[in-house]
Amino acid sequence: VSETHWTQSGETRLQSGETVIFSGHTEENAIHSEGVGFFLSKEASKALIQWEPVSSRIIVAKFRTQEKKINLVVIECYAPTNDAAEEQKDKFYDQLQAVMQGVSRKDIAIVMGDFNAKVGEANTGYELVMGKHGVGAMNENGEIFADFCLDNDIVIGGTVFAHRRKHKVTWVSPDHVTENQIDHICIARQFRRTLLDVRVKRGADAASDHHLL
Protein backbone atom coordinates (compact mmCIF):
# COMPACT_ATOMS: atom_id res chain seq x y z
CA VAL A 1 0.00 0.00 0.00
CA SER A 2 1.10 3.58 -0.72
CA GLU A 3 0.43 6.91 0.97
CA THR A 4 -0.59 5.42 4.31
CA HIS A 5 0.18 8.68 6.20
CA TRP A 6 1.53 6.55 9.06
CA THR A 7 4.64 7.77 10.87
CA GLN A 8 7.60 5.75 12.14
CA SER A 9 8.06 2.11 11.12
CA GLY A 10 6.87 -1.11 12.64
CA GLU A 11 5.15 -4.46 12.49
CA THR A 12 1.64 -5.15 13.79
CA ARG A 13 -0.36 -8.36 13.91
CA LEU A 14 -4.09 -7.94 13.39
CA GLN A 15 -6.73 -9.90 15.30
CA SER A 16 -7.62 -11.60 12.02
CA GLY A 17 -4.11 -13.06 11.88
CA GLU A 18 -2.73 -10.87 9.10
CA THR A 19 0.41 -8.81 9.64
CA VAL A 20 1.05 -5.17 8.71
CA ILE A 21 4.57 -3.85 8.20
CA PHE A 22 5.02 -0.17 7.46
CA SER A 23 7.51 2.65 6.96
CA GLY A 24 6.94 6.39 7.38
CA HIS A 25 8.58 9.62 8.49
CA THR A 26 10.75 8.95 11.55
CA GLU A 27 11.37 12.49 12.82
CA GLU A 28 9.93 13.57 16.17
CA ASN A 29 6.49 15.12 15.63
CA ALA A 30 6.68 13.95 12.02
CA ILE A 31 3.92 15.02 9.66
CA HIS A 32 1.39 12.43 8.56
CA SER A 33 2.25 12.26 4.87
CA GLU A 34 3.65 9.72 2.41
CA GLY A 35 4.13 6.29 4.02
CA VAL A 36 4.27 2.78 2.54
CA GLY A 37 3.57 -0.71 3.81
CA PHE A 38 2.48 -4.30 3.27
CA PHE A 39 -0.58 -6.19 4.47
CA LEU A 40 0.53 -9.82 4.73
CA SER A 41 -1.68 -12.89 4.83
CA LYS A 42 -0.83 -15.63 7.33
CA GLU A 43 0.88 -17.58 4.56
CA ALA A 44 2.92 -14.56 3.43
CA SER A 45 3.86 -13.80 7.04
CA LYS A 46 5.27 -17.30 7.46
CA ALA A 47 7.32 -16.88 4.27
CA LEU A 48 8.70 -13.48 5.33
CA ILE A 49 12.47 -13.61 5.79
CA GLN A 50 13.20 -9.97 6.52
CA TRP A 51 12.01 -6.46 5.76
CA GLU A 52 13.54 -3.00 5.71
CA PRO A 53 11.90 0.42 6.15
CA VAL A 54 14.07 2.37 3.70
CA SER A 55 12.22 5.68 3.91
CA SER A 56 8.74 7.19 4.02
CA ARG A 57 8.53 6.35 0.31
CA ILE A 58 10.17 2.90 0.07
CA ILE A 59 9.83 -0.37 1.98
CA VAL A 60 11.36 -3.74 1.06
CA ALA A 61 10.30 -7.26 2.06
CA LYS A 62 11.99 -10.57 1.22
CA PHE A 63 10.04 -13.84 1.11
CA ARG A 64 10.89 -17.51 0.72
CA THR A 65 9.54 -19.25 -2.38
CA GLN A 66 9.01 -22.91 -3.21
CA GLU A 67 12.37 -22.82 -4.98
CA LYS A 68 14.92 -23.10 -2.18
CA LYS A 69 17.59 -21.05 -3.95
CA ILE A 70 15.26 -18.26 -5.11
CA ASN A 71 13.71 -15.59 -2.88
CA LEU A 72 11.03 -13.04 -3.75
CA VAL A 73 12.00 -9.42 -3.06
CA VAL A 74 9.07 -6.97 -3.15
CA ILE A 75 9.78 -3.23 -3.17
CA GLU A 76 6.77 -1.01 -2.44
CA CYS A 77 7.04 2.64 -3.46
CA TYR A 78 5.32 5.99 -3.30
CA ALA A 79 7.05 8.35 -5.73
CA PRO A 80 6.87 12.17 -5.71
CA THR A 81 4.17 13.71 -7.89
CA ASN A 82 4.88 14.97 -11.39
CA ASP A 83 5.09 18.61 -10.23
CA ALA A 84 7.33 17.87 -7.21
CA ALA A 85 10.78 19.45 -6.97
CA GLU A 86 13.54 17.75 -8.96
CA GLU A 87 15.49 17.27 -5.73
CA GLN A 88 12.68 15.13 -4.29
CA LYS A 89 12.54 12.99 -7.42
CA ASP A 90 16.32 12.56 -7.51
CA LYS A 91 16.39 11.54 -3.83
CA PHE A 92 13.63 8.98 -4.34
CA TYR A 93 15.20 7.35 -7.38
CA ASP A 94 18.68 7.39 -5.82
CA GLN A 95 17.27 5.47 -2.84
CA LEU A 96 15.36 3.09 -5.09
CA GLN A 97 18.46 2.47 -7.21
CA ALA A 98 20.47 1.65 -4.09
CA VAL A 99 17.80 -0.88 -3.09
CA MET A 100 17.85 -2.47 -6.55
CA GLN A 101 21.61 -2.84 -6.44
CA GLY A 102 21.24 -4.83 -3.24
CA VAL A 103 18.92 -7.42 -4.81
CA SER A 104 20.58 -10.67 -5.87
CA ARG A 105 20.27 -11.48 -9.58
CA LYS A 106 18.99 -14.94 -8.67
CA ASP A 107 16.06 -13.52 -6.70
CA ILE A 108 12.74 -12.43 -8.20
CA ALA A 109 12.44 -8.65 -7.90
CA ILE A 110 8.99 -7.03 -7.87
CA VAL A 111 8.87 -3.22 -7.87
CA MET A 112 5.40 -1.80 -7.31
CA GLY A 113 3.37 1.07 -5.96
CA ASP A 114 2.17 4.57 -6.76
CA PHE A 115 4.81 6.06 -9.05
CA ASN A 116 2.69 9.04 -10.11
CA ALA A 117 4.02 8.12 -13.55
CA LYS A 118 2.11 7.96 -16.82
CA VAL A 119 4.12 5.76 -19.21
CA GLY A 120 1.52 5.87 -21.99
CA GLU A 121 0.84 3.63 -24.97
CA ALA A 122 3.87 4.37 -27.15
CA ASN A 123 6.84 2.18 -26.19
CA THR A 124 9.39 3.30 -28.78
CA GLY A 125 12.82 3.01 -27.20
CA TYR A 126 11.40 1.04 -24.28
CA GLU A 127 10.39 -2.16 -26.08
CA LEU A 128 12.41 -4.35 -23.71
CA VAL A 129 10.51 -3.18 -20.62
CA MET A 130 7.13 -1.95 -21.95
CA GLY A 131 4.28 -3.37 -23.95
CA LYS A 132 1.78 -1.32 -25.95
CA HIS A 133 -1.13 -1.58 -23.52
CA GLY A 134 -0.46 1.50 -21.42
CA VAL A 135 -2.92 4.39 -21.17
CA GLY A 136 -2.60 7.87 -22.69
CA ALA A 137 0.69 9.68 -23.19
CA MET A 138 3.93 9.60 -21.21
CA ASN A 139 4.56 12.49 -18.78
CA GLU A 140 7.84 13.64 -17.20
CA ASN A 141 7.52 11.23 -14.28
CA GLY A 142 6.69 8.48 -16.75
CA GLU A 143 9.90 9.08 -18.66
CA ILE A 144 11.97 9.03 -15.46
CA PHE A 145 10.25 5.82 -14.37
CA ALA A 146 10.61 4.13 -17.77
CA ASP A 147 14.30 5.05 -17.86
CA PHE A 148 14.73 3.55 -14.39
CA CYS A 149 13.05 0.34 -15.55
CA LEU A 150 15.24 0.21 -18.65
CA ASP A 151 18.40 0.75 -16.60
CA ASN A 152 17.41 -2.06 -14.21
CA ASP A 153 15.88 -4.41 -16.79
CA ILE A 154 12.45 -4.60 -15.15
CA VAL A 155 9.21 -4.89 -17.11
CA ILE A 156 6.20 -2.62 -16.47
CA GLY A 157 3.46 -5.22 -16.10
CA GLY A 158 0.44 -3.01 -16.71
CA THR A 159 1.63 -2.26 -20.24
CA VAL A 160 2.04 -5.91 -21.21
CA PHE A 161 -1.47 -7.32 -20.78
CA ALA A 162 -4.42 -6.34 -22.95
CA HIS A 163 -7.42 -5.21 -20.90
CA ARG A 164 -10.33 -2.84 -21.27
CA ARG A 165 -9.41 0.72 -20.32
CA LYS A 166 -11.39 0.58 -17.07
CA HIS A 167 -9.22 -2.34 -15.97
CA LYS A 168 -6.01 -0.40 -16.68
CA VAL A 169 -6.58 3.06 -15.14
CA THR A 170 -5.54 3.05 -11.49
CA TRP A 171 -6.54 6.56 -10.41
CA VAL A 172 -9.73 8.57 -10.90
CA SER A 173 -10.11 12.27 -10.05
CA PRO A 174 -12.73 13.26 -7.43
CA ASP A 175 -15.03 14.59 -10.18
CA HIS A 176 -14.62 11.29 -12.09
CA VAL A 177 -13.49 13.19 -15.20
CA THR A 178 -9.77 12.40 -15.27
CA GLU A 179 -8.39 8.85 -15.27
CA ASN A 180 -4.73 7.85 -15.24
CA GLN A 181 -2.55 4.77 -15.07
CA ILE A 182 -0.01 5.88 -12.46
CA ASP A 183 0.31 2.80 -10.22
CA HIS A 184 2.49 0.00 -11.51
CA ILE A 185 3.66 -3.54 -10.84
CA CYS A 186 7.02 -4.40 -12.40
CA ILE A 187 9.13 -7.55 -12.49
CA ALA A 188 12.71 -8.38 -13.42
CA ARG A 189 12.69 -9.19 -17.14
CA GLN A 190 14.38 -12.55 -16.64
CA PHE A 191 11.29 -13.61 -14.64
CA ARG A 192 8.75 -11.92 -16.94
CA ARG A 193 7.05 -15.23 -17.84
CA THR A 194 6.16 -15.83 -14.20
CA LEU A 195 3.95 -12.72 -14.19
CA LEU A 196 0.56 -13.99 -15.31
CA ASP A 197 -1.52 -10.79 -15.27
CA VAL A 198 -1.73 -7.20 -14.04
CA ARG A 199 -5.13 -5.53 -13.86
CA VAL A 200 -7.22 -3.21 -11.74
CA LYS A 201 -9.74 -4.62 -9.26
CA ARG A 202 -12.53 -2.06 -9.18
CA GLY A 203 -15.04 -1.53 -6.41
CA ALA A 204 -12.89 -2.32 -3.38
CA ASP A 205 -14.07 -0.50 -0.25
CA ALA A 206 -10.70 1.15 0.36
CA ALA A 207 -11.72 4.83 0.80
CA SER A 208 -9.21 5.85 -1.86
CA ASP A 209 -9.19 7.56 -5.25
CA HIS A 210 -6.93 4.72 -6.42
CA HIS A 211 -8.16 1.29 -7.48
CA LEU A 212 -6.53 -1.90 -6.25
CA LEU A 213 -3.95 -3.19 -8.72
Question: Where do the language-model regions lie?
Answer:
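A shared catalytic/ligand-binding motif for oxyanion handling
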Residues: 1-213
